[in-house]
């Protein structure tokens, strides 16, 4: 029976890893559909290469920083318990690699290629796993300190703060230091419209992300005996809540409608194992409305050119999710309890502060040394031709 359980656990978390790996295709198509036609190839190449760099760096450095585990041992040791530690690494890597995928959407259309790969290596090798280890591996006694202070540890079941808020708040300094796309904001105060280039691909990306998210949340249990149908249904309710709120607040804009489920899912990650499904519906709905309102505000009023709205989507909805776990996870609102609002506020604030500090330091250093931005000419030509020397649909075809 023990051998069967070990095999089942390894399969369970492997399937989760595969589902979250598929989410990276979702990130790619969501970005492809949102950016202008001249930057579509760049969106695809960025997501794949960021994932590849993330894998190597997380295997060699990042996983060890978070969990104190080294893979520099014989394969015989690694294969123990059906290779459970290896597939656990695979699963958690897909989370780590989501951070550069999130940032990619914010800095689209004008960022240089290789400086961002360097940023990916630093983020996945140190910045993200440092905070991941604090929350999910009890490092530096921070969780014990929060528990002594508030009576409960900071609870983030599937990463509203650890993954999404950290990714979104890392992206904000990158977007600010990079500056807006050329001619995005006019001297008279007007804003040039850059509508999504391909709504069907944007929708495809959103759907792939949404389906994969059930692996992201449910498989965060990490062993099959801890699987919870509550997590699955709460994810579903938050997804539809986010969609309907974005539909209403966004006035049936298809870009907002397809980001709505993502906003809801970002927010429900932290407390999906605690909330009542109706609580999850409310959390998702608030996130959907929050995304639409803050995307419009950042782009039009504050003139922060965050192309995919990754700061509102992941940064703010993730922050809301961290706090919401402390509200809707409580027994008073039908949750399972065992969570403290003050602990959630402390842990959420720590994640945001760490990401902002690290983001400004990293991207500020890269801007000073390598430069972050394409030249005006390269940006005008488009990242596809200036970086990759080919467009999404080349105009010239060879006459055979």
Which positions does each model-derived feature cover?
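Hydrophobic alpha-helical transmembrane bundles of multi-pass membrane proteins
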Residues: 1-400
